[in-house]
Amino acid sequence: RPLAADGRPCSAFLTGGVGTGKTVTAKRFCADLARYCQQHNRLLDVIFVNCRIRNTEYGVILEILRYFDRGFPDRGFATDEMLDSLKKHLELNRRPAVIVLDEVDNLLRNNSRNLVYQLSRFSEDLPNPSTLSLIMISQFSVAEMLDEASMSTFKRANAVRFNRYTEDELLQIINARAAEALEPDTLLPPEAAMIAKQAAEYGDARFAIEILERAASVAETEPEGNICPDDIRTAGSSVYSDVSEAKLDDLDDNRRLALLAIARAIKD
């Protein structure tokens, strides 16, 4: 509300496992916020950075700068110079900006806490309405990865935890995607429920959608054209939910030992 109403900077943490809707929620929120600002005769810049790809301070700042200047060179500047350039762009634009750092844990593991601290304090040196808000997305609690100085700037940040999807929620997602992407009656209720049940083990919407997509591709090659249980089994055998540290943490000791034995056997 402070950002939408008068451009005051805000911060937010979005945490949760793979496929729980963190990134799509952030994108939808930013799109709705930009639309709201436009309806009230204000503009808003939204910059998304995938920190799995851009996992260094230099790479993140470069990605942000190229939002404002697509021709900004990828070498020849120190990070401090690049931050000064970013500040000038924000001052010239005279409108608030939101930076979304997706999978920020990849950045923080590379000892880039200082960049997060600097971005979080940017607005202190910017005249209104040139403010900078920060949204950080991670599978893990970002608070545990920040130093004390950085964390002090996020004391009032909004924290949202995304839990795994339930089977019923996955079923709703599958039906919604099928309604948009497939011909009517291509996916019938029993088959939709079968996909939801298969994906519910992980609570991963991305996994469920990939099974639906693969099953639909298999069904296209068949005379009937409808998704059947065999199509789903075929699709499920070729799609795997992303492995993450958060998922490994959920394994009991016996499963961890079994996984370790398999990994060592493959390595040898």
Where are these regions (language model features)?
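Mid-core helix/loop region of P-loop NTP-binding domains shared across ATPases and GTPases
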Residues: D6-P9, D45, I53-E63, Y67-A157, ...
